[in-house]
Amino acid sequence: MAEETVIPSYSQVTDEKIQAALTADKGPGAKLVSWQVKDFTKKGDNYACIVTSVIVQYTLEGAQHETTYVAKIGRDMQVASLKTMFRQMFVREGKCLGEILPRINEVMRKIGRREISVAKCFHCCLDEGKEILLMEDLRARSFRMFDRQRGMDAAHATLVLQELGRLHAASILLD
């Protein structure tokens, strides 16, 4: 029997959501011209959501520009229990990236500390069936996708744990 190919749905990626991300990122003068989805994860990466990139053409002050966002798109699960679990996970991640971390980083700036290293979230939609996060594409700053099959070396694991420790300590600033 042939393997069934599942084509991911990008219906949550819309002009309105991309324009909202563009405005948050580049300012109110940025106007969306066009966009296209370009996958950069491989089959078998086993993410709880669809992770892809959106290449955006826009104008700002009369000049043409291009930028790329990482889109995390909620999956449409057919099994009710999985649907509930994945939705709860997505909502938690969205609130963390879209609300909590920006507040923590604002406090960190005010007290003269380095921000928590995390991709900026430019647009977060948590409406059921329309879940999407449009985030900074860290590949522009030379970050690369981590190969989970190979494991992490000690230097990178140390960096991750140090940043996680900073996040844990900084979370008290919101009390």
Where on the chain are the PLM-derived regions?
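Regulatory N- and C-terminal appendages and interdomain linkers associated
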Residues: 1-50, 57-66, 147
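Conserved ATP-binding subdomain of kinase catalytic cores across diverse folds
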Residues: 38-175
